[in-house]
Amino acid sequence: MKNIKNMKNIKSEGFIFFVLVFFICIIFGCIYESLHEGPYKKTLNSLHESTKYRHFNKIRLLTEYKDTLQIKVEQKSLRDYVNNDRYNNVNTNDYTSYKDKGEQFNDTICVVDKKKENVTINNEEECNKNFYQYLQYLEHNNKQDNKYEETNYFLQGNDKHIDSEHNGINKMYKETIHKTLTSDVSTENSYTHNNSRDDEPQNGKRTYNNQSNNNLPYDNSSYNISPYHGPNNNVPYNKSNNFEQCNTQDNKHCNDLDTYHTCYGPDNYPQKYDNYRQECDNYRQECDNYRQEYDNYPQKYDNYRQECDNYRQEYDNYPHGFDNYPRGFDNYPHGYDNHPHRPHIYPHGFDNHPHRPHMYPHNFPMRNESVGGPYYRPPHIIERSNYYKNPKKAPHNMMLPCDTMKDNKSICDEQNFQRELEKIIKKNNLQNGNIRDNHDTRINDYNKRLTEYNKRLTEYNKRLTEYTKRLNEHYKRNGYNIQNRQNSIERAQSNDVVLYGHNFQNAFRYKQNTRSYYPHVNSNEATHHQKTMYFTQQNNYSREEYPIKSEQHLYHVKSKRLEKKLYDYQNGTNPVTNFLERHF
């Protein structure tokens, strides 16, 4: 008894011991796991800077392009367009600045300031003043059939530099829309006497339509386009009005809409003018400071005014007017034409100098049209990396190229243009009877093939008729007709497959010669009846199973059954035979 009790105690103690060991292992395992995975959790919680940038950049790009695309898709009225901040706001992170598409403002008023608790006034004059600009904006931006999925094109990069490039293009595009929408033709906020190439604010801030430019990514992009024409034409470089506009007090459009720039490389002008640059001549304020009097100076610019102050400060290291230098900068050989500060006295054949004076009339007809109009953007010659290495944001280092393979707007423009062009071509073809639609083309091809088939079938029928006619003539010449020939065929021994009824699936099953096993097939009626009774007796089937069927049908059924047995026996499909072959 004591031994039994001791055994029970040992078992209970052992069980308790193993339970304790089990729980202790679980506890230590949890502690080890927490200690071991601590660094991983820490790494997971504090992502790498590049990973954070990727997530942030995706959200930012989607947000910015959502706003941009929503601008183009929204149906808006003229008054909403002119004075509503939701179309003029550049802050792309403002999620509340855009409302639903279905919400439309009252067309009888213009919203002046959304932040002033919907304070509205009648401003018909301001609305009408921007009418042409509104029409142009709708034409170029409101017909785009963009979808948010297209923004995924900008998220396929694998490094920070690619996203930065896309970011620059996005900012440039947003700024272009903003300046196009908010260009003011009045002179209230003019900064014509801002004598700084860096555009330091003259009166504290530089404004666009009563809005500060502090949230702009950079000043005065050469991508500012305003492709419209009207009484308030803001494009200063067309051949009809550029001289007058750049001579007026309000010439800030020469600065804001600086479409041409020396960084863009040579333009396709005629000989001796091929590298000509616009009046602003690589600087922003030259429309103010060069009074369009370049051609009135002497040849060597001895009486050059003190406008050198309007260049950047590093230009002041030279005495004003360059008069202390020998005429022609003889200190430099004339072959050194690439010196950035030599005066413009080289022969006219030296057209590659970036700062050559404008020695031809301002109404020269081929200045803009030869390169595609005032909105032409030639290829960029400065590397994109200079944009990120330029702390001063100098304008000649900040220009970004318009790469059609990465410019979402250009791609959408081309796609929409091709789509509309295909619609027009299809419509014209349908009107003219030319089938171009895919479905109609398939039908047309089918009709052609059917016509060809019918033609070939007709030829075949003709040949068959001719063959039949010749065969009948042959039979007549040989003294027998078709019936005699058929009877002779039936009397002959046949090795063909026997088909029963209209169901010819047995033709693929019974390959043996059935005539050798059923000699009664072509026998007389008495023998046929005897054979039928024999089959019935051998298979133990009574005629009551077929009370209504004829003897012919009865023979048909029995013969099929017997054929199946014979076929199974010859081909080894009998279950017993198959079993024996498999196991023995």
UniProtKB/Swiss-Prot annotation:
Residues 184-226 are annotated as: Disordered. GO terms for cellular component: membrane. Possible candidate for an effective malaria vaccine as determined by epitope response in sera. It is a single-pass membrane protein. It comes from the Eukaryota. The chain crosses the membrane at residues 15-35. Keywords: Coiled coil, Membrane, Merozoite, Transmembrane, Transmembrane helix. The keyword Nuclease does not apply. Residues 267-319, 436-477 form a coiled coil. It is found in: Membrane. Residues 184-194, 204-225 have a biased composition (Polar residues). This is Uncharacterized protein PFA0635c. It comes from Plasmodium falciparum (isolate 3D7). The lineage of its organism: Eukaryota, Sar, Alveolata, Apicomplexa, Aconoidasida.
